[in-house]
Each structure stands twice: as structure tokens, then as C-alpha cells.
Amino acid sequence: LTPMKIRILGCGGSFGSPLAWEKNGNIDINNPKNFRTRSSILIKINHQNLLIDTSPDLRIQLYQAKCTKIDAVLFTHQHSDHTAGLPDMRSMSLINKSIIPAYIPKEINESMINNYKFIFQGVKDYDPFMKAHILEDSFKIDDTEIKTFKHNHGSIDVQTYRINNFAYSTDLKNFYKNDIDKLKNLDLWIVGLLRYDPHPSHAGFEQILDYINYLKPKKTLFTHMTALLDYKELLSNCPQNVEPAYDGMEIQI
């Protein structure tokens, strides 16, 4: 299998961590691994940089990653903590003189284009800098094969992405039918864990551990974590080969 490097650009929930006001949940603010920007990852494979989601913190995330080129963006869903950084792709387009492809789930394709017309269609004096592609269950970006399917996130659906033996499932409440079996034989699974207790649109810690016990990936990382989850405490509660991610973490597969 083609080697890849995955960078955790951000692993926080929609508020980020710590919070923007006095109460910081349960985290130790002296531990830098508790400082989490909104969730997004960068995948380096086949000399390409693939981005999953464009968080509101994308500009600083890409700066810290020293990333000056994005070859494609894959979207999981339309919530603003996963899309609001989309305008930051303009600088990438200008630097590389390229139109950046965006792979968007069919049910949100039209609304994404309408919300960001200046990006996908252009406006007076400004050319479009991204091209929308409707997401398919299986597709290729050059030599990289990508598979995707929907999982439940409360009132909406979210895309799980799988590339070789790596998969990314943010904002997960539960899987449909037998779709979980599409995640067997993984070297790495990055999965959302908002908090310990179940949430109306997010699975709780015990349910995620049940999924991990069933799938048995070689390694699991938690993402999309609120300030209710302290890095050190959560790590102490994790079984072997399971741990919280942190911003800037890099994993080679």
C-alpha cells in the first residue's frame, strides 16, 4: 500500500478548546495538548496534499503545518465548524495558480455552492478558485483511491472517508446497517469523541469503545473533542492502541 502521512490540523469540537470564556470545562490549560482548534486533517499521499474539511481555524492550521499547496478538499458535511475556513483556499489557489477541486456530498452540493458563490462561480473582478465535484462512493484523485459512505450525526448524515487502511469518521452518532464492516482491517481509525456521555448527535465513550472492540484497528485516535475531555485523563481511560489526538500530531502509515 502507498505510504501516507496524516497531520491532525485540529481536533476540537465546534467551540474549540479551551473555551473563549472563563469556564474551561475539565481541561488542564497548562497542557498544550488541550489547546484544540476545530477539526480538520491533512493527508500527504502520492506527492499530494488532501484536506478533509476546512475548519474556521484553517489559516493558522496550514501555517503551522508549513503547507503551501492543497490538491483537493474532501468535505464530511456542511456544519460551519467543518466548512467556514473555505475562503482560506483562495490564497492556496493564488499561490499555486490552480483551481482546487472540492468533493462535496450530493445532498449539500447546491447549498454549498450557493453559500460560497464567489468561491465556486466567481463574482465581478474575482475568478472562481474552486471547482465542485459531487461525491461518489468510490473515486480517484490521480492514483489515490478514496472510498466513502454515510454515517448518522443526529438529524443529518456525515461522510466517513477511507483511503487504503486509514479511515476518518468525525461527528459520529451511529452507523447504518452493516456499513461499519467497511472499516475492518484498518491500520488507523480517527473517530470523533465529543465527550464521555452520549450526545443527541454524537456517540459517547462506551459506544465508541464498542465500535473499536468490534473493528480492532491497529490504532485509534479521538478527534472533535470538547473542553470536557482533558488529554491526560482521557489517555488514562483509553485501552491499548487508543489515544486522544492533539493539534499538530503526525502519523505515518
Model-derived features: where do they sit?
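Structured loop/turn residues at beta-strand edges in well-structured enzyme cores
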Residues: 68, 128, 144, 184, ...
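Core dinuclear metal-dependent hydrolase active-site scaffold
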Residues: 2-65, 131-178, 247-253
